[in-house]
């Protein structure tokens, strides 16, 4: 079997590192062909030393220059590229077999679309591609013959729980025709699911980034605490699985053992379970339709004391309700919400605003954006930019 060339968009981030771990566990199957990052020279340098990719790219031009000099000094032949255009070209490289799209935020949008338009097999971990570009993105997947495989643990669990016919029609699967009645999205509820609401004003960034089950970056940890993460996943799930609002259900499951479920019309519920480790869904997408070793501890059922399920309280999680409503309002609203949330979360991490202010900034930003029908990527980027400016203005008010 010929080794698969993997391009990792966001190799220095949490998902990127987990992807490299799966590659390391399967050196006979996969090669880290190209590694892409932002400006973290040291992390990228270490990855290049260890995995010897053909290419390494950094968005920051100065950082790329430093990386190039360091690699030359150590006689590492990796070719270093810089800037967004080079990253988009790597995402569409003719020698690339699979693209791990895991750059966080709107920055990951163009490279991911570039991979789709090149007809690549895209392992999707970048939420923004669907949150901001849902219809455009799904249409591009179909028009360019790209293969989309969801990496997010919840969407991957849903994917694994669907019939093969649905797996082959991501974005266009007719759920009701295949006997599916509901998609159940599970979430841990974050670290504050039992915290009294009156204490929410005192929540610190340190408390918010300490996720009880998953190892994640700061931004996504805060999103998990506010359940914006689940809101974004709700939006993604509706696009990925062609699901109506009536075909969606969101449940809090504190143990994060069941990663999501699918209800069928005959009363069956099919679920995917496992230890909360992102290497499982990463390995599943890389090897699909086969399986490969991920290096994950097997689930020990005797250590699971209980599995509990709680209905989400929108007073506790206003961002979740906001995301559900934003999808109903249209693509402009989900794009604006996502952009505002990036600004608001960073402001919270920088101690400029309180924990409860994140949802307020997001909601007010959507209110101030004029309803607009998105027709192309430029429209998306325009609304994204507008929403960021509005959110920054709200921070100053």
From Swiss-Prot:
It catalyses: 2-C-methyl-D-erythritol 4-phosphate + NADP(+) = 1-deoxy-D-xylulose 5-phosphate + NADPH + H(+). Pathway: Isoprenoid biosynthesis; isopentenyl diphosphate biosynthesis via DXP pathway; isopentenyl diphosphate from 1-deoxy-D-xylulose 5-phosphate: step 1/6. Its cofactor is Mg(2+); Mn(2+). Mn(2+) binds at residues 152, 154, 233. It comes from the Bacteria. 1-deoxy-D-xylulose 5-phosphate binds at residues 127, 153-154, 188, 211, 224, 229-230, 233. One of its GO terms (biological process) is isopentenyl diphosphate biosynthetic process, methylerythritol 4-phosphate pathway involved in terpenoid biosynthetic process. GO terms for molecular function: 1-deoxy-D-xylulose-5-phosphate reductoisomerase activity; manganese ion binding; NADPH binding. NADPH binds at residues 12-15, 38-40, 126, 128, 217. Its EC number is 1.1.1.267. Keywords: Isoprene biosynthesis, Manganese, Metal-binding, NADP, Oxidoreductase. Pfam families: DXP_redisom_C, DXP_reductoisom, DXPR_C. The keyword Transit peptide does not apply. InterPro entries: DXP_reductoisomerase, DXP_reductoisomerase_C, DXP_reductoisomerase_N, DXPR_C, DXPR_C_sf, NAD(P)-bd_dom_sf. Catalyzes the NADPH-dependent rearrangement and reduction of 1-deoxy-D-xylulose-5-phosphate (DXP) to 2-C-methyl-D-erythritol 4-phosphate (MEP). Belongs to the DXR family. NCBIfam families: Dxr (TIGR00243), PRK05447.1-1 (NF003938), PRK12464.1 (NF009114). HAMAP family: DXP_reductoisom (MF_00183). This is 1-deoxy-D-xylulose 5-phosphate reductoisomerase.
